[in-house]
Swiss-Prot record:
Thermal activity profile: Optimum temperature is 55 degrees Celsius.
Record note on what altering C158S does: Loss of activity
Positions of region (Disordered): 230-252
Similarity comment text for this entry: Belongs to the isochorismatase family.
Record-linked Pfam families: Isochorismatase (PF00857)
Protein name: Streptothricin hydrolase
EC assignment: 3.5.2.19
Function: Catalyzes the hydrolysis of the amide bond of streptolidine lactam, thereby conferring streptothricin (ST) resistance. Can hydrolyze streptothricin-F and streptothricin-D. However, this strain is believed to be a ST nonproducer, which raises the possibility that its true role may not be its involvement in self-resistance to STs. May catalyze the hydrolysis of naturally occurring cyclic amide compounds that are structurally related to STs.
Gene it is expressed from: sttH
Organism: Streptomyces noursei (Streptomyces albulus)
Active-site positions on this chain: C158 (nucleophile)
Amino acid sequence: MIRPGRCLWQPCLSGRKRSRPSGPVSRHGMMAAMTAPTAAAIRPVQALLVVDVQAAFVSGWEAVPDADRVLRCTRDLLSRARAAGALVVHLQNDGEPGAVDAPHTPGWELHLPVEPGPRERVVRKTEDDGFADTPLGDLLTDAGVTELAVCGVLSEMCVAATARTALVRGHRVVLPHDAHATYDIPAAPGISDTVPAAMSSRAAEWALGDEVEIVPHAAAVPFAAAPRPAVGPAAAPGLPVSPAAPPPSPVR
């Protein structure tokens, strides 16, 4: 089974490692540490990256199992980010021809409306990593953004790849546990039974290491105004205005 579209995970080693316990830890304690989202005082963030919230992944029969929850949490994040004057960037994946998210097909369309203005942008991409061959890095730099939140789909693919690169670039990254999702991992004979989507999402969080701030609920993420407006033309509703990413390579 291949997940819809071309949002394929490309691991990137950032050098960040999960710290080991300094003393003996019971099996129960270790499992609790691995399954409970990190809770800490949360400082406001200046930007929201909405990753691949496109029709193919959050609506219809191919939607991720937790699409309703992700959409509800993303709407809340968007509303509060806009009200605070934070930079909002919608990442839109350009799938390969024939994929459910191939450009200009119904599944490719952004599911949530884009509001025109100096602090909202759409960035198209052809890789998991929203920074790869896109203007995302320049947008954040030009707006003076140092702290950001990430939400969307798929947890272990485009969400993780984008969050990881943001960390490598020196950004503070907040990842709300209830604002990202993925698909079940199908059973593999001799390897594992089906892995539920929720477990896959949690494993994706854990794999990002210690520096990402994972919070249980999107509602707890506060926003502040971006220091400067984004440079370049403002987004019209539903229309990407960033330079289109290059066409996908036919060979992967």
